[in-house]
A protein has these predicted regions:
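Helix-loop-helix
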Residues: 1-293
Length: 293
C-alpha cells in the first residue's frame, strides 16, 4: 500500500519541487537572498498561485454546483419530508432514487462542489513530503544537496520552514505555528461567514446544507489546531495562502456575480442602478416610474 501511495505522489512531489525551485531561482535573480526564509516562503506562495490558477475552471464549476444545490433545497426538503420516519429499505431506496432523479433533471452534481478541495489534497501531501524530506536532507528532482541544505537552514522569524511544532526545539517555531493556525482559522471563518451572510437566500438558511456550513464555521478551527501542529511551517504557509486566495476569490464572485435573492444580489443591483443613473444625468432609466393620479 505504501509503495502504491509513493507511486501516486512521486510525480506530484517532482512537480512541487520544480515549481518551488523555479520561483526560488526567479526571486534570487531579482536580488533576494537565496538562503533567506522569505525567499523560500515566497516560493511556496508562488506554488499556490500556480495551483489556484490551474483550478479556476473547476472553481467556476464549484460555484455553479453550490448554487444548484441551494436552488433545489426546497425540492430536497420535500423529498425528505415525504419519507420522514420511514426507515424500511424500500422507502430509503425510493428516497435515494428520487434524489438522484432530481439531480439529473436539474443537472446538479454534489461532487462538483468538492472538486477543487479534492484535487488540492494530493498537492498538499506532496508538499508535506517534500518539506519533510528537506528536514531529513533528502534530494528530489531539482532540489539538489546544496538547495536542500539551504532550504533546511532557511528561517522565517527564527523558525525553520521545514520544522514542525511537535518536533521543534525552538520557541520561535511554536509561536509561528500558533500564529499561522490562528490566521488560517480566521480566514476560513471569514470566508464561510461571508458566504452564508451575504450570498445565501433567506429561505436557504434553515436547510440542512446551511446548517452544515454553520457547524463547519466552528469545526474548522479545531481541525486546524489538531492537525496544524503536525505539519511543517512551509505547509502551514501554503495552507494560509490558499485560504487567502479562496477568501479573495469568493469576495470577487459574491460582489460581481451574486446569488439571486441574497443581500449580495441586492447590493449588486444597487451598484448597477447607481452606474446607470450616473450615465444618465442622475436618473436610472430602468427604475420603475410612478403614475400620478
Amino acid at each position: 500500500m505504501g509503495a502504491f501511495f509513493d507511486s501516486i505522489l512521486r510525480p506530484l512531489e517532482l512537480a512541487v519541487a520544480y515549481i518551488m525551485v523555479g520561483f526560488h531561482s526567479a526571486f534570487s535573480t531579482i536580488g533576494m537572498n537565496p538562503g533567506s526564509g522569505w525567499t523560500w516562503a515566497l516560493s511556496i506562495v508562488g506554488l499556490v498561485v500556480v495551483i489556484r490558477i490551474l483550478l479556476i475552471p473547476l472553481f467556476v464549476k464549484q460555484i455553479k454546483a453550490s448554487r444548484g444545490l441551494q436552488l433545489i433545497q426546497p425540492q430536497m426538503k420535500a423529498i425528505q419530508e415525504k419519507y420522514k420516519g420511514k426507515t424500511d429499505q424500500a422507502s430509503r431506496q425510493a428516497m435515494s432514487q428520487e434524489t438522484m432523479a432530481l439531480y439529473r433533471e436539474t443537472g446538479t452534481n454534489p461532487l462538483a462542489s468538492c472538486l477543487p478541495i479534492l484535487l488540492q489534497s494530493p498537492v498538499f501531501f506532496a508538499l508535506f513530503r517534500v518539506l519533510n524530506g528537506i528536514g531529513q536532507g533528502k534530494t528530489i528532482g531539482p532540489l539538489t544537496d546544496k538547495l536542500v541544505a539551504q532550504a533546511d537552514a532557511a528561517t522565517l522569524f527564527g523558525a525553520q520552514i521545514s520544522d514542525t511544532f511537535i518536533k521543534a526545539d525552538t520557541t520561535a517555531t511554536r509561536v509561528l505555528t500558533v500564529v499561522l493556525i490562528i490566521l488560517m482559522s480566521a480566514t476560513t471563518f471569514t470566508t464561510q461567514r461571508q458566504l452564508m451572510m451575504k450570498n445565501m437566500p433567506a429561505s436557504a438558511l434553515d436547510n440542512p446544507f446551511a446548517q452544515q456550513q454553520k457547524i463547519l464555521l466552528y469545526v474548522f478551527p479545531l481541525i486546524f489546531a489538531v492537525s496544524g501542529v503536525n505539519f511543517p511551517i512551509g505547509v502551514l504557509i501554503y495552507w494560509l495562502t490558499t485560504n487567502l486566495w479562496s477568501m479573495g476569490q469568493q469576495f470577487y464572485v459574491i460582489r460581481n456575480n451574486p446569488q439571486p435573492d441574497t443581500p449580495a444580489y441586492a447590493a449588486w443591483e444597487a451598484r448597477q442602478a447607481a452606474k446607470r443613473a450616473k450615465k444618465n444625468g442622475g436618473v436610472d432609466p430602468e427604475a420603475p416610474t410612478q403614475t400620478i393620479v
